[in-house]
């Protein structure tokens, strides 16, 4: 995770790409992370949630309604529901109701289309990446750029996923120890 970047006082401020370059590409996509790295990010900060089959993927929250094309996908209309996440009720489609294979058929969209209108040009172009794909991608970007690029993952809604039988911590640790 490039811990060495934090051991010495850096010559310049470190740049952390929260959700990647989410002002320029749909958040939490490899394209968003690539743009952030190209623009000089030292760290990529992916938020992680779990699919029904226990695979960690990058999404800011468990509800897919605002960041994917799921609402336009009739084959998944019956999965719309209402769930309590982190003490609040949310209505939509939830990542833990989809297997990774199903999730990979969805495409990312801009979460704030009225604010970041330029990002809507990329709607439907990118898949939701897994944690392992992100690790591999950032490692390849580090090698290609000749500089260390770190990862600062955030496990989202841990209690919600634990109660669903999908404890994020165990999955995260098993990936890191593999």
Set out the residue ranges of the language-model regions.
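Phosphate-group recognition and catalysis centered on beta-loop-alpha active-site segments
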Residues: 1-178
């Amino acid at each position: 995770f490039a811990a060495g970047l934090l051991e010495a006082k850096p010559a310049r401020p470190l740049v952390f790409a929260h959700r990647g370059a989410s002002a320029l590409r749909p958040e939490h996509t490899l394209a968003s992370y690539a743009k952030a790295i190209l623009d000089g990010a030292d760290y990529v900060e992916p938020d992680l949630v779990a699919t029904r089959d226990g695979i960690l993927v990058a999404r800011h929250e468990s509800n897919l309604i605002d960041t994917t094309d799921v609402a336009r996908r009739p084959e998944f209309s019956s999965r719309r529901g209402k769930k309590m996440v982190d003490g609040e009720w949310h209505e939509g489609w939830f990542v833990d109701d989809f297997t990774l294979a199903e999730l990979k058929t969805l495409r990312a969209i801009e979460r704030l289309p009225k604010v970041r209108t330029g990002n809507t040009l990329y709607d439907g172009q990118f898949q939701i990446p897994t944690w392992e794909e992100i690790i591999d991608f950032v490692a390849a970007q580090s090698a290609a750029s000749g500089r260390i690029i770190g990862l600062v993952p955030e496990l989202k809604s841990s209690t919600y996923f634990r109660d669903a039988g999908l404890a994020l911590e165990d999955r995260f640790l098993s990936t890191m120890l593999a």
